[in-house]
Amino acid sequence: MKKLVLLRHGQSIWNQENRFTGWHDVDLTEKGREEAQAAGQLMKRHGLRFDYAYTSVLKRAIRTLWIGLDELDQMWIPVTKAWQLNERHYGALTGLNKAETAEEYGAEQVHIWRRSYDTPPPPLDETSPYHPRHDPRYASLKPEQLPATESLALTLERVLPYWNERIVPTLRDCDNVLIAAHGNSIRALIKHLDGLDDEAIMKVEIATGDPLVYELDDALAVVDKHYLRERD
């Protein structure tokens, strides 16, 4: 039986400040580091060992992975960092306080931007320092690959091809794979793995620092799914 473990990064600085983060690269808070450490210890208690790991190119996910692998004494395993596993891009909302945004645009409109499957927030202006075109980590990408905003549907459009082209072959070759990523990139994977419809996936909440374990057969069909903390 193969295992795929999905781990949402620990609390970030902008999570703590209640700001829309998206592709902006903020680090973990002390609480976030403790959540990552606890996740690693939890995986260790349950005897999980990994052959390969994936993460995004954002430090809150990368550091969560590092801390988790350190607890497992597995920092030596191969790791691929991929922009396709980044958080959903929140467009012009990036950096804004969520409560203040609701006051400005109305709570209902902000709820639609946050929780509808296919309605993205207003796009980020290319002159904004938050636009990925100014970030050297995306220098090799074509302009049309760089989002100025995303819905969950658009996030899925970049996550799913990466899943099929890179992660699936790794799972066929390896027994256990760990993905440390973000709430919405993980939500995109869950939608695919669980076969959820557009409405159902928007109700799924992803806990920070709690490993979600999928047990897969050799055809990569889901046999079992559980949060590790439920079995602790």
UniProtKB/Swiss-Prot annotation:
Keyword match Isomerase: yes
Keywords: Gluconeogenesis, Glycolysis, Isomerase
Disulfide bond positions: none
Active site: H9 (tele-phosphohistidine intermediate), E87 (proton donor/acceptor)
Pathway as given in its UniProt record: Carbohydrate degradation; glycolysis; pyruvate from D-glyceraldehyde 3-phosphate: step 3/5
Residues of the site described as Transition state stabilizer: H182
Pfam families for the chain: His_Phos_1
InterPro entries: His_Pase_superF_clade-1 (IPR013078), His_PPase_superfam (IPR029033), PG/BPGM_mutase_AS (IPR001345), Phosphogly_mut1 (IPR005952)
Superkingdom of this protein's organism: Bacteria
Region described as Disordered: 116-137
PROSITE patterns linked to this entry: PG_MUTASE (PS00175)
Catalytic activity from the UniProt record: (2R)-2-phosphoglycerate = (2R)-3-phosphoglycerate
Family: Belongs to the phosphoglycerate mutase family. BPG-dependent PGAM subfamily.
PANTHER family for this protein: PHOSPHOGLYCERATE MUTASE
Role description: Catalyzes the interconversion of 2-phosphoglycerate and 3-phosphoglycerate.
Protein name, per record: 2,3-bisphosphoglycerate-dependent phosphoglycerate mutase
Biological source species: Alkalilimnicola ehrlichii (strain ATCC BAA-1101 / DSM 17681 / MLHE-1)
Upper taxonomic lineage: Bacteria, Pseudomonadati, Pseudomonadota, Gammaproteobacteria, Chromatiales
